[in-house]
């Protein structure tokens, strides 16, 4: 099951949990109000899972691939890890399904504070277009994830600041409406 919390301000190893002391947990409902969607699926049977098939059809996720992030599997590993951890947004939703291993997605809340979302095998997350976020491995240094897209994949990340993009403006409008 996914777990999320507000992060401390430490610049130490990005793979560490970085929990506040005492911990400030973040609920699935709080994530939902940020536009973040979570599902728990059967990663052992992802190739034949009827629930995954239903989700892909309902959400029009017509394209997918599988990426393994590990120093022995990913070309330009160190460079990629640094790139993933740069704060950025996308113009489309980012959908990731963890098939093995674990890692962290960090997202900004409405007050611009970091929330760390711990992802492990079986977790699927959808980050809305326009949300500032980043990704890092945890201390296990390994994740295998399915990347899902509506139509052809668009890989472009826009590093912060990117507030003038329509996707960011739409996301900020969503947050304002959620606050009412």
From Swiss-Prot:
Pfam families: ARD. Pathway: Amino-acid biosynthesis; L-methionine biosynthesis via salvage pathway; L-methionine from S-methyl-5-thio-alpha-D-ribose 1-phosphate: step 5/6. Fe(2+) binds at residues 88, 90, 94, 133. Ni(2+) binds at residues 88, 90, 94, 133. It catalyses: 1,2-dihydroxy-5-(methylsulfanyl)pent-1-en-3-one + O2 = 4-methylsulfanyl-2-oxobutanoate + formate + 2 H(+); 1,2-dihydroxy-5-(methylsulfanyl)pent-1-en-3-one + O2 = 3-(methylsulfanyl)propanoate + CO + formate + 2 H(+). Its EC number is 1.13.11.54, 1.13.11.53. Its cofactor is Fe(2+); Ni(2+). Keywords: Amino-acid biosynthesis, Cell membrane, Cytoplasm, Dioxygenase, Iron, Membrane, Metal-binding, Methionine biosynthesis, Nickel, Nucleus, Oxidoreductase. Belongs to the acireductone dioxygenase (ARD) family. Monomer. Interacts with MMP14. HAMAP family: Salvage_MtnD_euk (MF_03154). This is Acireductone dioxygenase. It comes from Gallus gallus (Chicken). The lineage of its organism: Eukaryota, Metazoa, Chordata, Craniata, Vertebrata. The gene is ADI1.
């Amino acid at each position: 099951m996914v777990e999320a919390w507000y992060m401390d301000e430490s610049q130490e190893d990005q793979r560490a949990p970085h929990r506040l002391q005492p911990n400030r947990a973040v609920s699935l409902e709080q994530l939902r109000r940020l536009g973040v969607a979570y599902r728990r699926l059967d990663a052992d049977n992802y190739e034949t899972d009827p629930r995954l098939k239903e989700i892909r059809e309902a959400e029009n996720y017509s394209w997918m691939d599988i990426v393994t992030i590990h120093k022995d599997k990913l070309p330009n590993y160190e460079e990629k890890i640094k790139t993933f951890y740069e704060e950025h947004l996308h113009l489309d939703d980012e959908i990731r399904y963890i098939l093995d291993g674990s890692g962290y997605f960090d997202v900004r809340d409405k007050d611009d504070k970091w929330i760390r979302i711990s992802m492990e095998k079986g977790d699927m997350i959808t980050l809305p277009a326009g949300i500032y976020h980043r990704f890092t491995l945890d201390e296990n240094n390994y994740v295998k994830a399915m990347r899902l897209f509506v139509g052809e994949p668009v890989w472009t990340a826009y590093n912060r600041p990117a507030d003038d993009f329509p996707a960011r403006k739409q996301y900020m409008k969503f947050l304002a409406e959620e606050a009412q």
